[in-house]
Amino acid sequence: MASLKEIRAKVTSIKSTQKITRAMQMVAASKMRRAQERMEVGRPYADSMRRVISHLVHASSDYKHPYMVNRPVNKVGYIVITSDRGLAGGLNINLFKALTKSIQQYQDQSVQAEFAVIGAKGVSFFKNFGGKVTSAVTDYGDKPTFEQLNSPVQAMLEDYSNGKIDRIYVVYNKFVNAMTQKPTINQLVPLPDSAFAEEESGIQTELSWDYIYEPDIKTLIDELLGRYIESIVYQAVMENIASEQSSRMVAMKAATDNAGDLINDLQLVYNKLRQAAITREISEIVGGAAAVS
């Protein structure tokens, strides 16, 4: 059994760690709130872009952009969004489990896969897991820009346009609330029919207006679809950042609480040992006094 000195040293060490985890919990809570705000701010842009594209698509039923045309699937691409840092509970592990399940389903159909990665944890995962990584971005921080995240998106879209891949997915942790983050795999290209389904009812009425499109509908669709896809990926990154901070906050709170429980247990052991030592000393004194008398 450990001595009183060893237990005191262990309690001191755990208290020091507890201070760190409590501080990390508070920092993560603050960052989570800011990430939520940025996540909410980005949504109107994507919604507005979707409405504009819906108008264009319905106004030009004779033109189908390649990003909207389904074709036989021989190879798929995944844009995988992870965190740069750890200490976020099972956030990245749960995402990788969902990803590997999806990959396995395609492999069972003899469909190959390639990957574009955002986040250092994803890069580390694929070094061990294997797989063809065409592009990677790390150290994107808490407030990434479109320019920082653009290369993986463009690499995937270029491969799709060249016929190297036939479907693109975006993989990220969807922020549900502070306690819940959901690993999510959404089809990005070709754009699923549901992408503009919410706009259809309103568009039928609005199309009675006579719109003038400049320079022309085809050019606008070609330009806006790429930006729309970029906005979807950017929004997914913001959701993943909020998920990362909320998961870290929960993990650090659990670590802080566990440290408190461990300190209490050690303190109880310490008190019992100290009481036993005092009792033993008293017994020795009483025994010595009896022997002298």
Swiss-Prot record:
Q: Which Pfam families does the entry mention?
A: ATP-synt
User: Which key words tag this protein in UniProt?
Assistant: ATP synthesis, Cell inner membrane, Cell membrane, CF(1), Hydrogen ion transport, Ion transport, Membrane, Transport
Under the heading InterPro entries, the entry gives: ATP_synth_F1_ATPase_gsu, ATP_synth_F1_gsu, ATP_synth_F1_gsu_CS
Biological process GO terms, please?
proton motive force-driven plasma membrane ATP synthesis
Q: What does this protein do?
A: Produces ATP from ADP in the presence of a proton gradient across the membrane. The gamma chain is believed to be important in regulating ATPase activity and the flow of protons through the CF(0) complex.
Q: Where in the cell is it found?
A: Cell inner membrane
Q: What is its main location?
A: membrane
What is this protein's record name? ATP synthase gamma chain
Task: Write down the PANTHER family for this protein, in alphabetical order.
Answer: ATP SYNTHASE GAMMA CHAIN, ATP SYNTHASE SUBUNIT GAMMA, MITOCHONDRIAL
**GO CC list:** plasma membrane; proton-transporting ATP synthase complex
Subunit relationships: F-type ATPases have 2 components, CF(1) - the catalytic core - and CF(0) - the membrane proton channel. CF(1) has five subunits: alpha(3), beta(3), gamma(1), delta(1), epsilon(1). CF(0) has three main subunits: a, b and c.
Q: How does it sit in the membrane?
A: Peripheral membrane protein
Q: Which family does it belong to?
A: Belongs to the ATPase gamma chain family.
> Matching PROSITE patterns, A to Z?
ATPASE_GAMMA
In alphabetical order, the GO MF annotations are: ATP binding; proton-transporting ATP synthase activity, rotational mechanism
